[in-house]
Amino acid sequence: MSEDDILVTERLGKSFGGFAAVSDVNLKVRRGSIHALIGPNGAGKTTCFNMLTKFVAPSFGRILFNGRDITATRPADVARLGLARSFQISAIFPHLTALENVRVALQRHRGDSFDFWRSKKTLTPLNAHAMELLDQVGLADWANSVAVEISYGRKRALEIATTLALDPEMLLLDEPMAGLGLEDIDRIAALIRRVSANRTILMVEHNLQVVADLSDRITVLTRGRVLAEGDYRAVSANQQVRQAYMGVGYGYG
C-alpha cells in the first residue's frame, strides 16, 4: 500500500445468498483527494459504501485504512481511527439547537455519555469548539435555531458539522446532494470543497455536474464490479461507461 493512498480495498466483495452484490472491487483513494463512487441504480455503490464504513461485513477481501487492516473492525472503532461517515454520528436531534447537536457530537468524540440531566454549565467548555465547527459549515448564525426549524439544506450542513466533530482524517458522504434544491446544491458543494482542505473525501453521488466540479478521481461501478476509473474527462469519454451508466449518446458536457 502506497503512503499516497489512505484507503485501499483488495478484492472486496459481498454476497447475499447466491447473489453477488459486489465482486472483486480494488479501490485506491489518494490522500487529500475528493474521490467519487458512481454508477447506475443497482450497481453496488451502497453495498460497497456500507462495507467501507463497516455497516455491512464483507464476504471476502480486505479494507485497509492508513495501512491498517480494518476489515473486521467495528464501526465505532473505525470512526475513532479517523474514518467517519456523515450519518454515522449525525442522527440529528430535531428539538435541540444546532449548537447543542454539535456539542452532543463533541461529547461522543471525547467519550462522554450524553446526559439530558447534566447541568449545561458543565458543557460550556465545548461551546467554543462547537461554534467553530458551525462557522466552518456556514451555520454560525443558526447556532441557536432548533434543528427542526432550519431548512433541509442547512440540516445537511449540520450533519457534516456533527461529523467534523470527530475530527476525521477521511470523510465519507453518501449522496450529499439528495433532495436538495439548486441553491442548496451550490451551498453544499462549496461546503464540501471547503471542508476537504487537509482531509480526504469519498462520496457516492448521482449529480454528475457536482461530480465533475468536485472530484479529482472517479470510480464507476456496474453490476457490482469496477467498470472504469479516472478523472471526469476520461470516465465520461469511456464508451462502456456511457452504455452502462447513462446510455449511448448521453451528453456529459
What are these regions (language model features)?
Residues 2-253:
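Glycine-rich phosphate-binding loops of nucleotide-dependent enzymes
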